[in-house]
A protein has these predicted regions:
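Short, contiguous alpha-helical
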Residues: 2-41, 46-91, 126-159
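Acidic/histidine-rich alpha-helical segments that form the ligand environment
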Residues: 93-127, 134-139, 143
Length: 159
């Protein structure tokens, strides 16, 4: 390892720390206590998840489905080593009102996607280029962005 190289195990540990902070276990790195994505979603009913926060804004259900889709896309593309176009707009166009059962399924699917991303981080022995390394880091950045969107929407929804 050269002096300017990050050991894979350090990157893996850092990714797990940031993924856990974002999704499940706030340690105070960049979130306040009880504000991780899963903790936040546990406070949202299906009715609240179905509410668009503006005339053209997505529902919270769409936000959550989009996060899972993003994670699944990164996982599939990094594992395949191929980056093919996907329809990023489909979820925004099609996800509106959800039933309680549908909402629980959306949240469960997100948990599964999160587990797959953590496994991807563990399964990757080296990050061969900026694209794959950036893709891994973007899972945290992208999810944190949508967590912020969801938490801001809750200010309106839970008046």
């Amino acid at each position: 390892m050269t002096p300017n190289t990050i050991a894979v195990e350090h990157f893996t540990k850092a990714m797990h720390l940031l993924l856990d902070e974002t999704f499940s276990s706030v340690r105070g790195i960049f979130l306040d206590k009880n504000t991780s994505l899963f903790e936040t979603l546990d406070t949202i009913s299906a009715e609240e998840a179905s509410f668009p926060v503006g005339g053209r804004c997505a529902t919270l259900a769409a936000q959550v489905k989009h996060i899972a889709f993003y994670l699944d896309t990164v996982d599939a593309q990094v594992r395949a080593g191929k980056y093919e176009p996907v329809d990023w707009g489909e979820i925004w166009r099609t996800t509106r009102e959800v039933s309680p059962a549908e909402w629980e399924t959306i949240k469960a699917n997100l948990r599964d996607s999160y587990a797959r991303i953590k496994k991807l981080v563990d399964d990757t022995p080296a990050w061969p280029d900026e694209g794959t390394l950036g893709g891994a880091m973007a899972t945290v950045v992208h999810t944190a962005y949508h967590l912020g969107e969801i938490r801001q929407a809750l200010c309106v929804i839970k008046k």
